[in-house]
């Protein structure tokens, strides 16, 4: 028997992992987006707004989606959960049935839809907004090897108009 690497090897080949994530788990974009909307509903949101931005690239004639945003009026997340929600296997309901049990839905569905995912959330007012991100390109080239703690930040101006601040 040939030993490939006597010192062991990483469980995940990180340089290929990003693309594998983007191309697994969902049969179509609608299913991936439904997963994210379901997260809003589980967070007791009464309203979920999905904003899809598209543009015609200089080399083509058909418009292409370049950004998708989900805004809701749910309970929000603490800074720890803003960071943790992007971690694979960070489920919160191991004993329950249905979605959210294993902690792969948000990161996997988001990365299926786009190569960079940014999460913004707040509790006790929008002035307490925190954000964290996953970036496939940075993961693949080794720049992002962990999810950094959520940073206190402002909601991007283009979305602030949709947020109830009072």
Model-predicted segments: where are they?
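Bergerat-fold ATP-binding/catalytic subdomain of histidine kinases
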Residues: 84-99
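A short glycine-centered beta->alpha linker in the GHKL/HATPase_c
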Residues: 76-78
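Generic recognition of well-structured, leucine-rich alpha-helical segments
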Residues: 24, 43, 89-92, 113-116
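GHKL-type ATPase core
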Residues: 95-166
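Bergerat-fold GHKL ATPase/HATPase_c domain
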Residues: 1-49, 53-60, 80-83
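Acidic ATP/Mg2+-coordinating residue in the GHKL
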Residues: 72
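Short beta-strand element(s) in the Bergerat
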Residues: 64-68
């Amino acid at each position: 028997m040939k030993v490939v690497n006597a010192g062991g090897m990483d469980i995940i080949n990180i340089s290929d992992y990003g693309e594998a994530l983007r191309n697994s788990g969902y049969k179509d974009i609608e299913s991936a987006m439904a997963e994210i909307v379901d997260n809003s509903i589980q967070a007791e949101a009464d309203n979920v707004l999905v904003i899809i931005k598209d543009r015609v690239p200089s080399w083509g004639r058909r418009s292409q989606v370049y950004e998708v945003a989900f805004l809701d009026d749910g309970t929000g997340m603490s800074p720890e959960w803003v960071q943790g929600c992007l971690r694979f296997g960070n489920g919160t309901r191991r004993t329950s049935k249905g979605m959210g049990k294993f902690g792969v839905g948000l990161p996997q569905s988001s990365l299926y839809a786009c190569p960079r995912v940014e999460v913004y959330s707040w509790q006790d007012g929008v002035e307490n907004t925190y954000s964290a991100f996953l970036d496939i390109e940075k993961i693949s080239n080794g720049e992002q090897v962990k999810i950094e703690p959520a940073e206190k930040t402002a909601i991007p101006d283009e979305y602030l108009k949709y947020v109830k601040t009072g």
